């Protein structure tokens, strides 16, 4: 038993009884657990010595079973798009990549039933608190996955309606959010919240759509604003605030962590760099430092993970399951791409590089990714059509 401080008020809606705490019917808790299991799977699968308790298969199976259990044990709220719900797409992709087809088929059928329901609704953005831009992320991802293009377009339009781009750190890519301070803030009131987790989560579908429409720089600006907004509420000592108070009389973070974890999830899973050529602005780097020469342009990555880069002139999306990209270079004439990988570490002796089918490397393939032995010094890969 844990002794609770008797000086606190334990009679509010936020204080749950044992019976309420044991209730499995709140679907919004399931993506957190599924994501945790999925991360353990990927750490065990692609790195050495990080995860020792169970084999990687156990964690991927648990992630999938948790995802399915959400619809069985929490069917009411599972009808809505979930915060962090795009992790279910990632879990499904990995199940198929690993050949766990029976479990993958079951998860796919479960999620398609939800997407079928959304396809019949004009604006399927309900939620526990449906006014707060929480359902769009997963609704877009599954609508896009299952080919409900019109519904994906409606969802993206809704996101862009409340996620602006402007030259201001607080409002660029800031998704609509007003009410969570009232219920979960140290300073409790209704106000425009700066970079609540709506920013980090809604950036996921925006950047996903940008990679499908790489001529639309507006999408990149909005999506990257939301992506970086997700880390703007981390203090120097590492505290993650739910959001920043926008009232001119305050202008400071809220001193409760609230739901910050979902924002950090949005940054972690969506962290990526973009090398872009724009007709008006020339070459640009999002998530990196740019150096341009006569025949080439180079971007040194500055993102946290350094495991994803998009070369916009080629619409080339490169992701790593392990390892890190130090820089990417693009030859303007030959369209050749050079990818410099960071040296090996004790836990990461190999890089696992995912490329489109039209690009091939002379390395072994493991579940669709090129397994590349890293060295004590950086190595460079040359990518050609």
Kindly give the residue locations of the regions a language model identified.
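Catalytic domains of carbohydrate-active enzymes that cleave complex glycans
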Residues: 1-384
């Amino acid at each position: 038993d844990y002794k609770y401080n008797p000086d606190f008020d334990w009679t509010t809606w936020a204080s749950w009884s044992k019976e309420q705490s044991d209730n499995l019917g709140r679907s919004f808790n399931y993506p957190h657990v599924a994501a945790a299991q999925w991360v353990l799977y990927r750490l065990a699968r692609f790195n050495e010595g990080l995860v020792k308790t169970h084999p990687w298969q156990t964690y991927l199976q648990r992630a999938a079973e948790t995802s399915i259990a959400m619809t069985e044990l929490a069917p009411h709220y599972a009808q809505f798009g979930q915060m962090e719900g795009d992790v279910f797409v990632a879990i499904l992709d990995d199940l198929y990549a690993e050949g766990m087809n029976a479990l993958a088929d079951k998860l796919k059928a479960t999620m398609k039933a939800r997407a079928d329901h959304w396809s019949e609704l004009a604006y399927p953005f309900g939620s526990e608190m449906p006014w707060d831009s929480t359902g769009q992320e997963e609704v877009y991802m599954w609508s896009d996955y299952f080919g409900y293009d019109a519904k994906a377009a409606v969802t993206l339009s809704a996101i862009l309606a409340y996620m602006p781009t402007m030259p201001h750190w607080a409002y660029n890519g800031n998704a609509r959010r007003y009410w969570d301070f009232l219920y979960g803030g140290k300073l409790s009131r209704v106000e425009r919240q700066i970079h609540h987790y709506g920013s980090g989560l809604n950036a996921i579908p925006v950047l996903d759509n940008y990679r499908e429409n790489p001529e639309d720089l507006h999408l990149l600006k909005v999506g990257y604003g939301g992506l970086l907004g997700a880390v703007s509420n981390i203090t120097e000592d590492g505290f993650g605030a739910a959001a920043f108070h926008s009232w001119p009389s305050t202008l400071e973070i809220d001193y409760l962590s609230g739901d910050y974890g979902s924002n950090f999830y949005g940054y972690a899973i969506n962290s990526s760099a973009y090398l872009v050529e724009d007709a008006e602005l020339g070459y640009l780097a999002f998530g990196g430092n740019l150096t341009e020469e006569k025949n080439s342009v180079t971007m040194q990555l500055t993102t946290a993970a350094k495991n994803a880069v998009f070369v916009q002139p080629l619409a080339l999306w490169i992701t790593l399951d392990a390892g890190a990209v130090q820089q990417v270079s693009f030859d303007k004439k030959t369209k050749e791409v050079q990818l410099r990988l960071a040296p090996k570490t004790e836990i990461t002796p190999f890089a696992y590089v995912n490329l489109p089918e039209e690009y091939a490397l002379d390395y072994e393939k493991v579940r669709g990714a090129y397994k590349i032995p890293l060295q004590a010094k950086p190595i460079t890969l040359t990518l050609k059509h």
